[in-house]
Structures are given as C-alpha cells and as structure tokens.
Design a protein with these regions (language model features):
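Helix-to-loop junctions at the C-terminal end of transmembrane segments
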Residues: 71-84, 276-290, 373
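Helix-breaking motifs and short loop linkers at transmembrane-helix boundaries and internal kinks
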Residues: 84, 105-107, 122, 256, ...
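Short amphipathic helix-loop junctions that connect adjacent transmembrane helices
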Residues: 38-55, 245-262
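Juxtamembrane intracellular "pre-TM" segments in multi-pass secondary transporters
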Residues: 4-15, 195-231, 253-254
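A membrane-interface helix-boundary motif in multi-pass transporters
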Residues: 168-181, 371-397
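Cytoplasmic helix-loop-helix junction between adjacent transmembrane helices
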Residues: 115-154
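C-terminal transmembrane helical hairpin of 12-TM major facilitator-type secondary transporters
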Residues: 291-334
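Conserved MFS/SLC helix-loop-helix module at the cytosolic interface between two early adjacent transmembrane helices
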Residues: 70-109
Length: 413
C-alpha cells in the first residue's frame, strides 16, 4: 500500500514537472513569436531596401542564429547531462532576454546579427526541454509528452504573433520590448518554480568529444540503425523552412499583408499546430502506430506546400494550412522511434544531436529558401514566381517520405 502511494506521488511529481516545462516553453516561444511579424519591416527600415532584399537578409539572420546554435547545442546538451537541466534552461532564458534588448535598440543591421548570435549561443532551451521530457517520460507516454513541446510551440505561436502583429502597429521595435519583458518573467518563473528532472545517479561527466557538434552527428555511428530515421527528420526540418522562413515575406510580396495580418495568420498556424501536436497526436499516433503516422504526415506536408505555391488569393493560404498542419503528426512519431532506441543516460545526448540537426537544417534551409524567393522575385528575375520555395519544400518532404519508408522497413525486417 505504502509502495502504491509512493508510486502515485512519483507520477504526480512527473506530471507537475511536465506542466512546468510546458509553461516555460510556452513563454519562451511566445517571446519568439512576438517579434516575427515585424522582422521584415525592421530589416526593410535598416537596409533601406525592398521586401525581396529583406527576405534574403532575413534568411542570413536565421543562418547566423542557426550556425551558433549548431555549435553550442551539443555543448549545452552535454552540460545538462552533467549539471542537470534546470540551470541550463535558466541561463538560456536569460540569454534570450539580452537578445531581445539588443534587437530593440539596433541602429544598424549588424546589431541584428549580434543579437541573433547571442540567442544562438543560449538557444538551448529546446535541447534541454527535450531531454527534460525524456527524463520524466516512460516508453508508453514518450510520444505524447514530446507532442507537448509541439503544443507549446503551437500555443506560443498563437499568442506571440498576434500580440506582435498588434504591437507592431505602434512601431517596429515595440514587440522587442515586450519579448524582453516576457523572457525575464520566464526566467523568474523558472528560477522559483522549475524542479530538476535529472537524478544525480543518471548524470555523467562532461566530455568535449561528445560536445563537439560534428562529433554529436558523428556519434550517430553508435546507432547505425537510426541513420535513416535521422536523415528523414533532417529532410523534414529543411523542407519546413519553406514555410517558416518564407511566410511573412511571401505574403507581403504576394498579397500585400501588413504586420497585423501576418500576426493573425501565424496565430492561426499556431492554433492548428497546437490542436494537432497537443491533441490529435495523442489519439492518431497510438491508433495508426508510428510508421503510418510518419507516411500520412509527410504526404500531408507535401500537399500543403504545393498548394501554397500556387495560391492566388489571401483566403487560400488559410484553407491550405489545414492539410499542411495535419502533417504535424509525422515529427513526434519520428522522434518517438529515435528516443525509444537509446538508453536513459543518453537521452540528453540524442536530443542534443537532434537539435544539432535542426540547427544544421536551419543553416541550410533559411538561406536556401530566402535566396530562392529572392531569385524569383527581384527586379531582374528570369520570371516571377514567389511560390518557388514551397515547390522546393514539397520536393524535400517527398524525399523524406522515401528515406523514412526504407529505414522503417529495415527496422521491421
């Protein structure tokens, strides 16, 4: 009886911990979401150029953030395996506050790059949050709990861009002040509320070989059976940048949207992502199984991308979001398969590696998509076709489906 009570209390503690990490992620993503609708306008102001040029700079800004995150994510992941998740998450949140303050006061485009580099160094909250979730999950509820990170993204993107779009009407820098305040609130919340998830006996010494970003990817050689799945995840990440990096610039160019409209549309994307990742994943994935979830999700992503490419009216973008966002069942399913193949003491490392891959995809994806957009929209373009990045994204999603198919078939054999 006493053992049962203890078990119930332990489960309650784990549920509370997942609740805490969900709120921390939610506030983090909301701060990030707030600045998205105004980035195009701020870049245009600082470079005195048009939206086509601003898109190209926007791609390189994301590249600067991603390349620093790529270098530092495995370092941070391994530090969290040694010192625990809590201190690392708190340092990350503090770094983001500093980034937003720098962006708010930036007199030149160089300042934007410096701010993004600082955020890249400390932007490990997702790595550490993923490891945190792995710490407090069982094999049965791991996919469901990873889905909660997606739901925090979704909710943060409902609240953030809508606030950012509305605040952006008072000036392109106002949302940055709001994001900085929000990040400091999150830091304080984490400081007083967030419990540690990594038990002392599950910690391990810091190792520079494991903390090397290229080493983190080469470390995958330990898991040869996972290479195909990781490649499918990588292609999925790169392809999704057709939407992530392009949405604001595409809709400004194609439909002349303002910050408010961009904010509302991103809020709707967030709502749909939240419904899919926080709700549907819990029902669909266990019923379909991870394998079918991967195929159906990737097919829906591909269809959504191709529809965006040929949209001619604003309302079409909203309708086409439905198949695209339903594709979100693929990510947690792939992540769940990968996480189930490694030991508890290695979750921090494998999540750090996945974040490194996400960052590597952000090194390739945004400049590729932004330059594709620029190539087909600038004044001397061979022919004008703003939807070109979506076509490229759709092709990458198709490739991801093929790679996932062969890899999962091998796992069955």
């Amino acid at each position: 009886m006493h053992h049962l009570t203890k078990l119930t209390m332990l489960q309650k503690d784990k549920s509370a911990a997942i609740g805490f990490i969900f709120i921390t992620m939610l506030i983090d993503i909301t701060g990030w979401g707030i600045i998205i609708p105004v980035i195009p306008k701020l870049i245009e102001e600082l470079i005195h150029g048009d939206i086509s040029e601003a898109a190209k700079i926007g791609g390189w800004l994301t590249f600067a953030y991603a390349i620093t995150q790529f270098v530092f994510a495995p370092v941070i992941g391994n530090l969290s395996d040694k010192f625990g998740r809590r201190p690392i998450i708190l340092i990350s949140l503090f770094g983001f506050s500093l980034d937003y303050i720098l962006l708010a006061f930036s007199p030149t485009i160089v300042w934007l790059f410096i701010g993004r580099i600082i955020a890249g160094v400390t932007g490990a909250s997702i790595t550490t949050a993923s490891a945190y979730i792995a710490d407090v999950s069982t094999a049965e509820n791991r996919a469901k709990n990873f889905g909660l990170i997606g739901a925090a993204f979704g909710l943060g993107f409902i609240i953030g861009p809508v606030i950012g779009g509305l605040l952006g009407q008072y000036g392109s820098r106002v949302p940055f002040y709001a994001a900085a305040v929000l990040c400091m609130v999150n830091f304080l919340y984490g400081f007083f509320i967030l419990p540690e998830s990594l038990k002392k006996e599950n910690r391990r010494p810091f190792d520079w070989r494991r903390a090397n970003p290229v080493g983190a990817i080469l470390g995958l050689r330990k898991y040869p059976t996972l290479i195909g799945l990781i490649a499918a995840i990588f292609l999925l990440y790169v392809g999704s940048h057709a939407v992530q990096s392009n949405w604001s610039f595409f809709t400004i160019y194609q439909f002349n949207w303002d910050e408010r409209m961009i904010g509302i549309s991103l809020g709707i994307i967030g709502l749909l992502v939240g419904v899919v990742q926080g709700g549907l994943v819990r029902f669909i994935n266990p019923r379909l199984g991870n394998e079918k979830s991967v195929y159906i999700g990737l097919a829906l992503y591909t269809i959504g991308m191709l529809l965006f490419a040929f949209a001619t009216e604003s309302w079409m973008m909203f309708v086409f979001l439905i198949p695209y966002c339903l594709g979100g069942i693929a990510g947690p399913a792939l992540q769940s398969v990968v996480a189930s193949k490694v030991e508890p003491s290695e979750q921090g490392e494998i999540q750090g590696t996945l974040t490194s891959l996400m960052s590597a995809s952000s090194i390739i994806g945004p400049p590729t998509m932004a330059n594709t957009f620029y190539f087909f929209t600038h004044d001397d373009a061979p022919f004008k076709f703003a939807g070109a990045p979506f076509i490229l994204g759709g092709v990458l999603m198709l490739l991801s489906t093929v790679v996932a198919y062969f890899s999962l078939r091998k796992h069955r054999a």
